[in-house]
């Protein structure tokens, strides 16, 4: 069985960061970095796709020297530095309001203990 036609080449490839480009200790694999750079040199767009926030993903994107867009917050934010604004696919406002209600209704819950990452744009987790 032939999976791909002869001469076929992808236009875009996406890679997760944690556990794919990094090891179990979150150390970046420099062989993986070199492979991503070779893909882009060959004209294949590389997308970083991760659950990390945009600021973290952008830092790695710059370090590697990529040109493709980034997909972060588990698909909640799509962005490229050349775009005027990121595409935010979810707001997280309902979860934030639920957390505030929970803190008001249950005095044993410290509202200061219900937080999320300050860099999150599309998710708000309890």
What is each residue range found by the language model?
Residues 23:
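Short helix N-cap motif at coil->helix boundaries in the Bergerat
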